[in-house]
């Protein structure tokens, strides 16, 4: 069970990295770091919630 939750967390984090890197490409053109941080928070926080929800199942 622990291994399964670790697997899901690692897959979620790899998805987050892909989303954040695509966001950073767009925001680096406008050089807006706060927008990047906001976007990263929007992506990471639900991902962590989903990972903990999966871990409890």
Swiss-Prot record:
Where is this gene product found? Membrane
**Keywords (A to Z) from UniProt:** Membrane, Transmembrane, Transmembrane helix
What stretches pass through the bilayer?
34-51
Question: Can you name a GO cellular component term?
Answer: membrane
Tell me the membrane topology, using the record's own terms.
Single-pass membrane protein
**Main location class:** membrane
Q: What is this protein called?
A: Uncharacterized transmembrane protein DDB_G0283513
């Amino acid at each position: 069970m622990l291994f399964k939750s670790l697997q899901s967390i690692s897959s979620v984090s790899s998805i987050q990295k892909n989303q954040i890197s695509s966001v950073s490409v767009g925001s680096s053109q406008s050089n807006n770091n706060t927008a990047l941080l906001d976007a990263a928070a929007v992506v990471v926080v639900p991902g962590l919630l989903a990972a903990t929800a999966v871990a409890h199942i």
